[in-house]
């Protein structure tokens, strides 16, 4: 019963609490740092044929078995744009392809690449402001299996979403964490719909090892940690 409290609204309590924003604290950085010289530009996806929204929603299912072969890079490019793509940069905040409470966008996207055209195998981070990738390190299949509690399947790429809670906490204090949970649902659903529209399959993973998932991506587990994952492969 205690866990159910997380699902309930606490907005009335905010009137008694001053957020860091209200205290005049500077906002956290909107993006993580990176070396611009190491950004891998992603393929253009503007001519990629897709199904209609109606057809896509009718066909949407969770896939756990995938065909062999590599995913074309333009399809991966499309999925990244559909899930965290930057539509407009307003300076203090950004508008993206997914909604986020107060446009706070507290997530980072990491990829465990096993079979994508034009990309070597390994772990990457998505750079939305450049629509590109940064290579982080070589893959580790043993640690991946531990991180996903042996739900490795045979997908070509695995999306990992991390959360930087303070991006949301800075404005919304105690209600931030429910907002974060709602927001990540928007992100993953966009992945399902976008993938289905280009003949790819998705299996979202909510059951994972927190310690090993954070270790796999090199996250500290406090200021940034994994909140969700999803397999993507050829359907």
What function would you assign to each model-found segment?
Residues 125, 158-160, 229-231:
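Conserved hydrophobic/aromatic beta-strand scaffold that supports enzyme active sites
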